[in-house]
Amino acid sequence: MTAAEPGSRLEWSTPPAALAAAAVGGLALAGAAVLTGDGSSRLLIGLAAALLLGLAALGVRQRPRLTIVPGAAPRLIVRGLLGPAEYPREKILRARVVGFRRLGRRVPNLELDVEHDGDDRLLIFGRWDLGTHPQDVLDAMREHGLAPRER
């Protein structure tokens, strides 16, 4: 599939089903916190509910997490908590997939070194953020000329 085909993917974000599951889990925990009789249990379950609901809200707020805008001057839009940030080709200093050890296995992450308002910034995206394998996103970035080749 090429970038010109209508089915090619140019946006990545946390899957909606995962966000819905986090929200439902948070609501279930909130209900359990209300029904429990012990004060310390109510506090701990309530905190867990707030964290899950916050995670779901954050995921919804940041959708889509990454977007490639194709064209003569392609750019990458990264949506964060405070809103979107645009990075044209010349502001993306390095892009690579790096594997980190987590819970006994290697987990791939997309690392982007970008120039943001005169400072260098490291952006790290995992499968949760992208909804797909980070290598797929890096391949799409390379296809659109947004990822400098590793030396």
Predicted feature residues:
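Short, ordered beta-strand-loop transition motifs
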Residues: T2-P6, V69-A72, R102-G104
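Hydrophobic alpha-helical transmembrane segments
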Residues: G37-A50
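Conserved beta-hairpin
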Residues: L53-L93
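Low-complexity, S/T/G/P-rich flexible repeat/linker segments used as non-globular hinges
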Residues: L138-A140
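Non-transmembrane, membrane-adjacent beta-strand/coil modules in membrane-associated proteins
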Residues: I77-D136, R151
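N-terminal membrane-targeting/pre-transmembrane regions
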Residues: M1-G39, D119
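Cytosol-/stroma-facing membrane-proximal "stalk/adaptor" domains immediately downstream
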Residues: R142-R151
